[in-house]
Amino acid sequence: MEISKVRIQDIPEEERPRERLIRNGPESLSNSELLGVILRTGSNKENVVSLSSRIFSEYSIKQLSLANVSRLMKVHGVGKAKAAQIAAVFELARRLETFVEEPKRKVCSPKDVYTLMYPKMREQKKEKFITLCLDTKNQILKEEVVSIGSLNASIVHPREVFKSALMESSASVIMIHNHPSGDPSPSREDIMVTEKMVEGGKLLGIDVLDHIIIGEGRYVSLKDEGFVR
């Protein structure tokens, strides 16, 4: 039987492009195999492996990247949906070439954190608990909302607080939450949560640099108050 007539599901699983990509990484696939993963299905007359190989026999990768949807649809077996998929992939590749990553924001003091977070938190009607995940230069890797509602030491768990920090390989975190009343004075619960997270961070090798409470036009740093050691 011609390979073009073989259904993709009849090809041994370990030989299918998608499964090989998952197992060995995308660099292990040829151009036509990568295209097959993108297209997913072939036509009524040929499977996706054969279709992708034929496309690359008619076009170089450069020509394919420059072809618009109308031109791609002239390839036998390529309809509007497949043409759009191909065009979208190459457009993403072009955008990657011109992508410039924004410089990471650096925080060096409680005032820096307050200046950054106050505009986002001043009109919140409920308490919002946020962590800033930082690298070794105190540059922000990620800002994560951990919980919304009254801060409670029995509810806020280190697992949620440090989840993003672990995923981002953060060196440290800063915790922030607001007091909708406008008074940033720490409650007993605030202090308990702080102490609990500081201990949790020590176990995980992630420093808790501070816990900052934001009120109306002012803030309190629990590090400055002596509760973060």
Swiss-Prot record:
Originating organism: Methanosarcina barkeri (strain Fusaro / DSM 804)
GO BP: proteolysis
Organismal lineage: Archaea, Methanobacteriati, Methanobacteriota, Stenosarchaea group, Methanomicrobia
UniProt keywords, alphabetically: Hydrolase, Metal-binding, Metalloprotease, Protease, Zinc
Residues of the MPN domain: 106-228
Name recorded for this polypeptide: UPF0758 protein Mbar_A2303
Residues that bind Zn(2+): 177, 179, 190
Mitochondrion keyword on record: no
CDD domains: MPN_DUF2466
Source organism, top-level taxon: Archaea
Motif window: JAMM motif: 177-190
